Amino acid sequence: GALPWYHSFGLTLTLIASALHQSKLICILDPRAGKPPFSDILKAIQDYKVTLLHAVPAMYVALAYHPNVAKYDLSSLKACGAGAAALAPATAKVFEGETGATLFEGYGLTETSPLASADPSNKRQRKFGSVGFPMPDTIIKIVDVDTGKKEMKTGDDGEVAIHGPQVMKGYWNKPKETAAVMQTIGGKRYFLSGDIGHFDKEGYLVITDRKKDMINVSGLKAWPAEIEELLTEHPKIQMAAVIGIPREDDPGNETVKAYVVLAPGQTATEEEIMTWAKDKMAAYKRPKAVEFRDALPQSAVGKVLRRILRDEELAKMGEKWEPSG
């Protein structure tokens, strides 16, 4: 286990799950340890012949593109689980190619203990870019973002609403905050997740982004996660983060800026990335600025912290960030 146990993902799917299945748990206190970073976890997988690994997407990026990954015997790995943030299909494919393991993705929140949906266990039924199907006894609806009551059509984005035995009763001693995220639909109590997504024609759940992270480009909605996923398809890009920056000449509207971490040994220019993006995404989604970084700010569980990037940009402008949506 390489996830902190104070986070619901690490607590349930690493600590509790290993106890329930009576399996040996190899505890990695710091997955970044080693020279170069993340070498110790690769060595632990090899030495202890680890068969199951749960991690966040940022960790899979680090392992998949590790400069010495080919030197380790990772053949014991059979299955790996990803969650807590969006997993780029390009990362999953590189990781599976390097290890031979099958990478499954799940979705949920602390408020849903944490799983709400997950990929089917049959690899052939897995679909990259989706988070599978609702868990047993769980109902997921896609509702409009304004009222949280109107169900959206298949394929249309809306807020993800979750009903099931794993949904929290509420926030401790915070009745107003609880009331704001709980909605009664068809006589059942649903949790409004704050995530935007849709069901595709085959019934797979696709998470688009967080509602609060929407970028307003002249009235059009641009979702950072979608743009980040497209950017990581570039052969030179290892990780990307996207934010909206307020336009000083057009109050209420934003422009798209991308922060990019290149794969080891790669070099690129802003113009090169922006030119490449012209053929990959609509004009309003394309980054108008690209900044190269050695690393992106991340939380303790590996989530990219877009808020820090926003704060850095807005500090230059002397403004305070407020969500568009």
What are these regions (language model features)?
Residues 46, 53, 164, 169-170, ...:
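AMP-binding/adenylate-forming catalytic core of the ANL superfamily
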Residues 133-137, 148-182, 222:
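Conserved ATP/PPi-binding loop(s) of AMP-dependent carboxylate-activating enzymes
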Residues 6-51, 66:
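Conserved AMP-binding/adenylation subdomain of ANL enzymes
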Residues 282-304, 322-324:
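AMP-binding/adenylate-forming catalytic domain of the ANL superfamily
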